[in-house]
């Protein structure tokens, strides 16, 4: 399983939780399973700003949630600066490099 490390500041954390919460509400309203989104929200909330490790599924979930939030704000004529910055930081997330295949 591949994981990525995102550099996350306080603003990115806030907007990411807001985007995932919107995704959580839509999934819950439609009756679809939303436990994975809920666990990710709680994990991000418990993480201090700095580096956030995301698995491949979590990365895709966060990317899609931020993109949906950005699209909603564009449709309503709102500002997308915070969502754009968080999405850019998420897309720049790196796959960790382990020298000789060893994890630290």
Predicted segments with their positions:
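Positively charged, low-complexity terminal tracts
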Residues: 1-104
């Amino acid at each position: 399983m591949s994981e990525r490390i995102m550099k996350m500041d306080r603003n990115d954390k806030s907007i990411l939780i807001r985007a995932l919460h919107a995704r959580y509400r839509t999934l819950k309203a439609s009756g679809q399973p939303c436990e994975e989104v809920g666990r990710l929200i709680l994990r991000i909330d418990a993480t201090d700003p700095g580096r956030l490790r995301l698995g491949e599924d979590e990365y895709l979930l966060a990317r899609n949630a931020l993109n949906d939030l950005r699209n909603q704000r564009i449709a309503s004529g709102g500002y997308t600066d915070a969502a754009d910055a968080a999405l850019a930081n998420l897309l720049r997330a790196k796959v960790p490099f382990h020298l000789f295949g060893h994890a630290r």
